[in-house]
């Protein structure tokens, strides 16, 4: 079957953005060429989107620039906006608190147009080239992401990347989820299969401690109803120390009974409660973000799993979301 590709809008600079609608089984998803955004996810019989999006490109260029996007080349924080890569020091954009690089700032893949490489009724592959030196990062990098749906209601995302010089890569989808379609996610049940997490500083960078969740508010190893600030979430959960085969790491269940199981190959999962992720006309805590990735600020913590990618090597991430309803 042919792909369903439609005009979505134009950027502030006049570039056209397209929307690709994927369908299979009970699931429908919409992916944008802007930022490789996962704009809409719908489960048959549920009268609202499970992820939070917008119908306006201008929102994704502004306050919603992280909503649903694929963030890279390095997601999350880099303390001091600097890193040593293959013995050379590089400096990046100071995009947060004047001393931290957050989501690669104005050069991230979430604020770029991607090219459609292939598409059919249930899948799309997008690609983008990142030139050497852009944002301070070394290497000419070729990045591709494939989204596809498998019946009955599974959405998968595969990210690959190569470079012609030693560099660092760490991508994550940054979708916000609310399985009830309500103004606040309060009352969802959450389980994260992690024994440890990374405590954060006042500017939300890792302290360097790898802390046990046991005995803390961050212990989500068993399903638990969460509420706003219980716990306050903007931390990375440590799922392991290396990329592994796809395995289930998270279960989120709304009061509606709609359930999402997330699986990933990645060793970390940044959980964020959406306190500052406010869509136009909406309020804080509308959705929960779960970002499968390597641990944040890894370049400044040699004890963390490495995000180095050498010339000739290939970056490869696989993440899956599976949905059910009562």
Where are these regions (language model features)?
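An exposed, glycine/acidic-rich loop-and-rim segment of catalytic or binding clefts
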Residues: 1-326
């Amino acid at each position: 079957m042919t792909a369903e590709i439609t005009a979505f809008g134009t950027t502030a600079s006049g570039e056209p953005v397209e929307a690709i609608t994927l369908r299979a089984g009970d699931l429908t998803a919409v992916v944008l060429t802007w930022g490789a955004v996962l704009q809409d996810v719908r489960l048959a019989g549920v009268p609202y989107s499970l992820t939070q999006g917008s119908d306006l490109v201008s929102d994704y260029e502004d306050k919603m620039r992280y909503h649903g996007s694929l963030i890279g080349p390095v997601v999350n924080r880099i303390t001091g906006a600097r890193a040593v890569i293959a013995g050379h020091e590089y400096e990046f954009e100071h995009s947060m608190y004047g001393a931290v690089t957050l989501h690669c700032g104005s050069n991230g893949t979430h604020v770029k147009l991607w090219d459609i490489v292939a598409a059919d009724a249930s899948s799309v592959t997008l690609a983008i080239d990142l030139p050497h030196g852009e944002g301070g990062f070394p290497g000419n990098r070729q990045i591709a992401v494939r989204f596809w749906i498998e019946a009955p209601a599974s959405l998968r995302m595969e990210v690959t990347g190569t470079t012609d010089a030693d560099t660092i890569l760490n991508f994550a989808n940054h979708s916000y989820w609310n399985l009830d379609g309500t103004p606040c996610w309060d009352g969802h049940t959450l389980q994260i299969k992690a024994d440890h997490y990374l405590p954060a500083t006042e500017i939300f960078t890792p302290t360097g401690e790898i802390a046990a969740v046991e005995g803390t508010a961050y212990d989500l190893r068993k399903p638990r109803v969460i509420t706003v600030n219980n716990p306050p979430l903007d931390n990375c959960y440590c799922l392991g120390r290396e990329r592994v085969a796809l395995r289930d790491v998270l279960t989120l269940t709304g009061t509606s009974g709609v359930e999402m199981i997330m699986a990933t190959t990645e060793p970390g999962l940044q959980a964020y409660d959406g306190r500052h992720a406010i869509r136009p006309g909406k309020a804080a805590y509308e959705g929960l973000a779960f970002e499968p990735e390597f641990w944040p600020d890894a370049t400044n913590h040699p004890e963390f799993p490495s995000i180095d990618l050498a010339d000739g090597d290939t970056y490869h991430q696989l993440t899956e979301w599976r949905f059910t309803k009562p």
